[in-house]
Amino acid sequence: MVWHGFLAKAVPTVVTGAVGVAAYEALRKMVVKAPLRAATVSVAAWGIRLAREAERKAGESAEQARLMFADVLAEASERAGEEVPPLAVAGSDDGHDH
């Protein structure tokens, strides 16, 4: 009876281990066959894509934070009784009088 309980618990563990070893060996053989340069280029391309996406999201977040801060500052100035000048975008002076 004790052996039956032991085997009932051990068999799934052994099967899981065997499947893991088989998957590891298959992956190892596939990596050995694949050219290292192609794999390196693929990983670098993924890294570039991720960096661009992170940069885009950071830019959007920075713009959102700037606008939120400007709104808070304008409301605070308004409550304090000061007139709030419109925000100017840096580098927007094109030399024309409108």
Curated annotation (Swiss-Prot):
Source organism: Mycobacterium tuberculosis (strain ATCC 25618 / H37Rv)
This protein's name: Uncharacterized protein Rv0968
Pfam families noted in UniProt: DUF1490
Similarity remark: To M.tuberculosis Rv1991c and Rv3269.
Region (Disordered): 77-98
Induction details: Highly up-regulated during the early stages of invasion of the human blood-brain barrier.
Gene Ontology, cellular component aspect: peptidoglycan-based cell wall; plasma membrane
